Design a protein with these regions (language model features):
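Charged docking surfaces used in two-component/phosphorelay signaling
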Residues: 17-25
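Active-site beta3 strand of CheY-like receiver
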Residues: 46-52, 57
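The feature encodes the CheY-like receiver
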Residues: 16, 58
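Acidic catalytic/metal-coordinating carboxylates
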Residues: 35-38, 61-64
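Conserved acidic carboxylate
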Residues: 10
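Short hydrophobic/Thr-rich beta-strand motif most characteristic of the beta2 strand and flanking loop
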Residues: 27-34, 42
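Conserved phosphotransfer cores of two-component systems
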Residues: 44-46, 68-75
Length: 80
């Protein structure tokens, strides 16, 4: 069985790298996005199983991102 596809949304590159490196070490499948608009695009294009979301994004407030995703998906979101 495949592990879940995780979308990591974090604008701070070292933090994003730490998270994705950890996921890779445990053989998780993941996508990453550095801003809110990219996150929305990745989520709608790839239908991840869960999203790890930074609330302090430069282009789109994380809460607004959650509201936008909720208009078309029940994707589980964990705020980081």
């Amino acid at each position: 069985m495949n592990k879940p596809l995780i979308l990591v949304v974090e604008d701070d590159a070292p933090v994003r790298s730490l998270i994705t490196t950890t996921l890779r070490a445990h053989d998780y499948r993941f996508l990453s996005a550095a801003n809110g608009e990219s996150a929305i695009l990745e989520a709608s294009s790839h239908n991840p199983d869960i999203m790890l979301l930074d609330l302090g994004l430069p282009d789109l407030d994380g809460v607004e991102g959650i509201h936008r995703v909720r208009t078309w998906s029940n994707l589980p979101i964990i705020v980081i």
